[in-house]
A protein has these predicted regions:
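Active-site bordering "gate/hinge" segments
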Residues: 2-431
Length: 431
């Protein structure tokens, strides 16, 4: 049996169980909030499966703009600011409904399931399978204790399930992340940039990222600009990259891959930029900004991404790794990253560095430090500093800093206000 067939079989087994969850009764009245939680997450996972089928059947290409908007909204509506105060992804809500002991852990589990949106659009079936299986395993542990002993499972037993998930799949994730970083073979975003009909804004929904007014307005605005202006923007960006190598005496001809980072809506500029990089002998590596705990998500995004649908949601979960962070976890991460870089060491030497399109003009954000959100202990913070230093040292063994360069160019986003178009044109002139 082929790997894909095996994965589909495992997926269907997990889904069979997940489909039953909304209709199941819990005997203990005191545990009804847990039924609500598992039902909410199960319904989200069934929407993920519906989206997978939608994509497999090619409906992404035939659906109307309104249909694509509705699906995108359905996938993200639970964490939008107007709904977040009632969402189990919100640690404050999870703690209030599910208790102080389990609340943050439950919010983390749902957040990890939400990382499936991007994986679904990329067709990464293995990522779907392992998370659906994880959710099913956690649910089974709760149901067993509720039915047999009329109580919750121990916190330690559930944390252990989640701990072994992040540990067991650390090697797979490390290899995938290094491959994404240094091997130009992942063409998901590059294909959208190169092949999409950019005047048809339906293309924005092919990523699986949240599409809001910023992305739509940016794409529309870039579509309104003359070709000459787009060329100027892209050429300034790519020439800045090439000149970075030239002025520092680094040999660009030895390099094969450029790490392209941008926000959705800039595709018309990025198409010209990729053509320019092609002429330099560079193929793009373009990866999604991480959402899963296995890929080290951050409020500071690298890769391709959209304006956050809810920055408070991201802030609430920025330290979720503290649920697992210990010396053994750090050692495991370091070990699997070393193995992954060793596997792709030739490709790593061809990594030329990042070419970044940054944005400015987002509305001010004053994060709320919620007591219910996961926090690092002082010991964990120290451990994390050491771990990051070791990871950086490891990466520098394979991606030689003295042989790479970078470029950064910045543009305003529509959220900046009525002055957006004027400010954008002035930014082009200054660049």
């Amino acid at each position: 049996m082929e790997e894909r067939e095996l994965l589909l079989e495992r997926l269907e087994l997990a889904l069979d169980r997940i489909r039953e969850i909304p209709g199941e009764d819990w005997q203990e009245e005191s545990l009804q909030h847990w039924k609500e939680y598992f039902t909410a997450v199960a319904k989200f996972l069934l929407l993920i499966e519906d989206t997978r089928q939608f994509l497999e059947q090619g409906k992404q290409n035939t659906a109307t703009l309104e249909e694509l908007k509705q699906r995108n909204h359905a996938l993200y509506e639970d964490i939008l600011p107007e709904n977040y105060e009632n969402s189990f992804a919100n640690p404050a809500v999870a703690v209030k409904c599910l208790g102080e002991e389990f609340g943050a852990l439950a919010a983390f589990l749902y957040t990890e399931m939400r990382s499936l949106i991007g994986f679904t659009y990329e067709g990464r079936l293995d990522e779907l399978v392992i998370r659906m299986e994880l959710f099913s395993e956690v649910y089974a542990a709760f149901v067993y204790e509720e039915q047999e002993n009329h109580r919750l499972p121990s916190y330690a037993s559930i944390r252990e399930i989640l701990y072994w998930f992040v540990s067991d799949y650390a090697d797979v994730a490390a290899e995938a992340r290094v491959r994404e970083l240094v091997c130009p073979g992942n063409n998901f975003a590059a294909d959208i940039i190169r092949r999409a009909e950019l005047t048809d804004l339906r293309y924005l929904y092919a990523y699986g990222e949240y599409v809001g007014e910023n992305e739509l307005a940016m794409a529309k605005f870039l579509n309104s600009l003359p070709e000459e202006t787009i060329n100027t923007m892209a050429d300034t960006y790519t020439e800045g990259y090439r000149i970075g190598f030239e002025v520092t005496g680094k040999d660009l001809s030895k390099k094969a891959a450029v790490d392209v980072r941008y926000q959705l809506g800039f595709e018309r500029m990025m198409r010209r930029a990729l053509e320019n990089f092609d002429k330099m002998g560079l193929q793009p590596v373009i990866y999604r900004a991480a959402a899963s705990i296995l890929y080290n998500p951050s409020i500071y995004k690298n890769g391709f991404y959209s304006v956050s649908p809810n920055r408070q949601y991201e802030f609430d979960h920025k330290d979720d790794k503290a649920l697992f962070l210990d010396k053994m976890y750090c050692s495991r991460k370091l070990e699997v990253m070393h193995t992954a870089f060793e596997k792709y060491k030739t490709e790593a030497r061809g990594y030329a560095g990042p070419a970044v399109v940054e944005t400015f003009g987002e509305k001010d954000f004053a994060p709320v430090n919620k007591p219910e959100a996961v926090k690092m202990t002082d010991e964990q913070s120290t451990l994390m500093v050491e771990h990051r230093a070791q990871m950086g040292q490891l990466q520098r063994q394979y991606i030689i800093e003295e042989e790479r360069s970078f470029t950064i160019i910045a543009f305003p986003i529509p959220e900046v206000g009525d002055c957006f178009e004027e400010l954008f044109r002035e930014t082009i002139r200054i660049n």
